[in-house]
A protein has these predicted regions:
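RNase H-like (RuvC/DEDD) metal-dependent nuclease/polynucleotide-processing core
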Residues: 2-7, 11-292
């Protein structure tokens, strides 16, 4: 598919007013030099609300491919249910987003952690409040395929360094807001190309795909980042490229936008398992057959 521009967004689900972990990288269709987009209004950091307003304000005459680093849905295919044995459990991804949003309406800035306080639903999460009795280390089909390169953390886990669940809760609220502005892949058909497309990304996968691993205490070096960018047909970042904090969120955003542009040219990266209509799919994970 052809796009006018690409955004790679390293995500954060934390409760703060501003999210230090949100970084936004951009490439246009003619450029091979990715750049970091600064937050609006001279703020030092983005927050989720300002980012969503920014995405809504983009030129409607252009088509963008936008990648968010969070799981777009929960496992479904293993038990044919997101929340096993829960009455009125949602049965589609869009109903799931609305469900998560509804149980967090009192929270500003798209924070999603209030669901841990809803008695029956909280039992499915490993959260900062408690480990629910129905919590399971479940995996989506796309995560099973990704495991050949590196394994994502379980989406119901919201505790510890591998906790992706908090980001997904906030992210699903965001998808519920943006679903009328953009096609969200792979849940929507992509016939309306004017709307642009939002996909799920996994920055670690894009590094590991080329056997690039961070050092234990220092993270990715500039040389490693540039080696990875070269694999995705992008120019290196300059020696003045800055990364702040141990998570190197800028590096994740930069490699993601390069990978997005690279993968978008190849039809095989738009193919998914049939279960992806319920669970979502990590963009860049190659699907081979339905035998899972």
């Amino acid at each position: 598919m052809l796009f006018d521009g690409f955004f790679g967004i390293d995500w954060s689900g934390d409760k703060s007013k501003f999210q230090k972990g949100i970084k936004v990288a951009y490439l246009d269709k003619t450029n091979i030099n990715p750049k970091i987009i600064a937050p609006p209004n001279k703020n030092r950091y983005w927050n989720r609300s300002s980012l969503i307003e920014y995405l809504k304000s983009l030129n409607s005459n252009k088509s963008y491919l936008i990648g968010f680093d969070f799981a777009f849905a929960y496992p479904f295919e293993d038990y044919k249910n997101y929340f096993i044995d829960l009455n009125n459990s949602p049965d589609s991804a869009k109903k799931l987003w609305d469900f998560i949003d509804f149980h967090n309406l009192e929270n500003s800035n798209y924070y999603g952690g209030n669901i841990w306080e809803k008695k029956s639903i909280s039992e499915y999460y490993n959260s900062p409040i408690k480990r629910g009795v129905k919590f399971k280390s479940r995996r989506r089909i796309t995560e099973i395929y990704a495991k050949q390169i590196c394994s994502p953390s379980p989406t119901f886990n919201c505790v510890g360094p591998g906790a992706v669940g908090t980001g997904s809760l906030a992210g699903m609220r965001v998808l519920n807001t943006l679903k009328n502005n953009y096609n969200i892949w792979p849940f929507d058909n992509l016939k309306n190309k004017k709307k642009g497309v939002i996909v799920e990304i996994f920055p670690t996968l894009y590094f590991r795909k080329h056997s690039i691993k961070p050092k234990k205490n220092t993270g990715y070096s500039l040389n490693q980042i540039n080696d990875a960018l070269k694999k995705y047909d992008c120019l290196p970042v300059s020696k003045n490229f800055k990364m702040f904090g141990p998570d190197q969120d800028e590096a994740d955003a930069i490699i993601s936008v390069a990978a997005l542009k690279y993968f978008s040219k190849y039809i095989q990266y738009w193919k998914t398992h049939k279960g992806a209509k319920k669970e979502g799919w990590i963009y860049g994970v190659k699907f081979t057959n339905d035998k899972v």
